[in-house]
């Protein structure tokens, strides 16, 4: 079980949005590289990064900030937002990313995702962002008619490293993770699922460690970490203890 601290990039800065709204952005750090190093120093083992501008533009916008992050931390980094082509995937992986997250293109061109998994085994994740139970695309700005599980099942057996499932209706407002929907997805597919959107307190970490959530790879935390609602040491100690028990 992994707790992924999140760095969302808007105009080169670390921000958190409310409900995916770019107009409701709170700046937490103007130096993404320093924030990445701070998370590493706190004991986190992975980093989740999103290029928010890129998600809307359909191409990388905050590339300099991502490069600064990669230079500042030894931890593996996963990146989503605006990655839409095989060349783009290859370019980022060659620059040191551990894995890319494909969201909009997973809806628009699932064949590309399958091909990417063949070319870059273990380095391609799919981001499923849902609003009102339906998949959203283009930086959450457009709704589709696709169901969450319907989309996930398209990639069974393709070699997708993980599915990052975000409930947009809870993202950035500390409402708690949508456990019912998240666990339903985890039970429906064999691909590891990472929960995102709404993680609010240490209670969500404890919930993540319950036996019925064993199929989850982990969860992503943003605002709760930045606001001090979750103590990194306490959270990581809980996860470590749970791993030792399961071992």
Swiss-Prot record:
This is 1-(5-phosphoribosyl)-5-[(5-phosphoribosylamino)methylideneamino] imidazole-4-carboxamide isomerase. It is an enzyme of class 5 (isomerase). The active site is at 8 (proton acceptor), 129 (proton donor). The lineage of its organism: Bacteria, Pseudomonadati, Pseudomonadota, Alphaproteobacteria, Hyphomicrobiales. Its main location: cytoplasm. Its EC number is 5.3.1.16. Pfam families: His_biosynth. InterPro entries: Aldolase_TIM (IPR013785), His_biosynth (IPR006062), HisA_bact_arch (IPR006063), Isoase_HisA-like (IPR044524), Isoase_HisA-like_bact (IPR023016), RibuloseP-bd_barrel (IPR011060).
């Amino acid at each position: 079980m992994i707790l992924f601290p999140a760095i969302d990039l808007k105009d080169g800065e670390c921000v958190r949005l409310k409900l995916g709204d770019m107009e409701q952005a709170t700046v937490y750090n103007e130096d993404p590289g320093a924030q990445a190093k701070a998370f590493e120093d706190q004991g986190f083992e992975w980093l989740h990064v999103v290029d928010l501008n890129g998600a809307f533009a359909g191409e990388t916008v905050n590339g300099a900030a991502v490069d600064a992050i990669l230079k500042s931390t030894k931890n593996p980094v996963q990146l989503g937002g605006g990655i839409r082509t095989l060349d783009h995937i290859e370019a980022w992986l060659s620059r040191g990313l551990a894995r890319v997250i494909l969201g909009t293109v997973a809806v628009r061109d699932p064949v590309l995702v399958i091909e990417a998994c063949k070319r870059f085994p273990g380095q391609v994740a799919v981001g499923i962002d849902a609003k009102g139970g339906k998949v959203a695309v283009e930086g959450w700005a457009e709704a589709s008619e696709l169901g969450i599980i319907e989309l996930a099942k398209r990639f069974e057996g393709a070699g997708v490293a993980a599915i990052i499932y975000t409930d947009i209706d809870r993202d950035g407002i500390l409402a708690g993770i949508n456990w019912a929907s998240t666990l339903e997805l985890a039970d429906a597919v064999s691909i590891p699922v990472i929960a995102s959107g709404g993680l609010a307190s240490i209670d969500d970490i404890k919930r993540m460690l319950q036996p019925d959530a064993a199929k989850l790879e982990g969860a992503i935390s943003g605002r709760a970490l930045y606001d001090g609602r979750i103590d990194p040491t306490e959270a990581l100690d809980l996860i470590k203890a749970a791993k030792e028990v399961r071992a």
